[in-house]
């Protein structure tokens, strides 16, 4: 693809499905987006190039060392901050935003204090990694020995929350502080993996949840002086949202925006990075995203009306 003459090129750390979708979103606007494998060869970066990432953490290679510390890497310091659950939860506490009670688990002598102050039942999570249900343990006094000595200092303990359901919101912040938000999306997880996302602005509690979510995510993005798309996952407990996870990037719960909104989350991220004019985000219709995992490709899916198929052959 020939580089754009209208806008600076955007280089993406990571060449997975999110990087590919960013590249597709840039094409109609003549924005050259180049996803990069971590082990790709080093090259001379154009002076006006913009760097972003499709993932919070990356392996150390000559290319990631060059781009990951480059002055043109937007939100450079945010990725490491939010990739670590300890610093992420500390940020939420600093901003006085609702999240599950938690603590850093340093050694086994803490267990009595944890069960007293955090909860009788806790979820122990690795500080980094451990997504899609991996690197997480449900712990009570009866199975605390499941957390081995090598994990202490590398995990946090959160109170187990018997939530009603899960939602997420995706928003973007521009350089001047303006923000745009998609409607709150309802998510169904199975074994810690997102399987369905449903968006419908007529859902009960949608308006109150939207106000809460926009306020919380907006406060976070302002504090970080963030530019681009960020996702926030929440537990719903009664009429209250508890923040579960933040992702400083485009997010799988926002895939519905590719067909359900005039501006997808991928295009929105590029618009924010390049500081392009952007109207309010209006959904076209109620939308559903189904995450096809561990299933064979079926060409009959293409017969489904008013749908798009995105097949990227990701292994389970």
What do these predicted regions represent?
Residues 211-232, 248-295:
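Active-site "cap" helix and flanking loop/linker of ATP-utilizing ligase/carboxylase catalytic domains
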Residues 240-250:
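A short beta-strand motif that forms the metal-chelation/ATP-contact edge
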Residues 173-178, 236-240, 293:
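Short acidic-glycine loop/turn motifs at beta-strand connectors
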Residues 6, 94, 271-316:
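Peripheral (often C-terminal) accessory segments that flank ATP-dependent C-N-forming ligase machineries
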């Amino acid at each position: 693809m020939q580089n754009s003459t209208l806008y600076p090129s955007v280089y993406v750390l990571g060449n997975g499905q999110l990087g590919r979708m960013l590249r597709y979103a840039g094409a109609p606007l003549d924005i050259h987006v180049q996803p990069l494998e971590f082990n790709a060869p080093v090259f001379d970066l154009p002076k006006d190039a913009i760097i972003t990432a499709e993932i919070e953490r990356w392996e150390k290679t000559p290319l990631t060392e060059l781009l990951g510390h480059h002055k043109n890497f937007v939100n450079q310091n945010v990725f490491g901050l939010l990739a670590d659950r300890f610093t992420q939860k500390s940020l939420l506490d600093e901003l006085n935003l609702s999240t599950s009670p938690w603590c850093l688990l340093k050694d086994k002598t803490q267990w009595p204090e944890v069960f007293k102050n955090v909860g009788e039942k806790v979820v122990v999570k690795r500080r980094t990694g451990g997504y899609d249900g991996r690197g997480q343990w449900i712990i009570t006094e009866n199975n605390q020995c499941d957390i081995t000595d090598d994990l202490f200092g590398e995990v946090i303990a959160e109170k187990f929350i018997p939530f009603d359901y899960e939602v997420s919101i995706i928003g973007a912040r521009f350089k001047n502080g303006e923000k745009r938000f998609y409607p709150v999306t309802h998510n169904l997880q199975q074994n810690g993996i997102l399987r369905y996302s449903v968006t419908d602005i007529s859902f009960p509690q949608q308006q109150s949840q939207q106000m809460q979510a926009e306020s919380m995510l907006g406060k976070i993005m302002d504090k970080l002086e963030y530019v681009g798309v960020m996702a926030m996952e929440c537990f719903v407990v009664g009429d209250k949202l508890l923040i579960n996870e933040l992702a400083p990037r485009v997010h799988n719960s926002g895939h519905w925006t590719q067909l359900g909104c005039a501006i997808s989350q991928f295009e929105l991220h590029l618009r924010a990075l390049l500081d392009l004019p952007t109207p309010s985000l209006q959904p076209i219709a109620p939308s559903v995203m189904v995450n096809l995992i561990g299933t064979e490709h079926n060409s009959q899916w293409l017969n489904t009306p008013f749908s798009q198929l995105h097949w990227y052959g990701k292994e389970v």
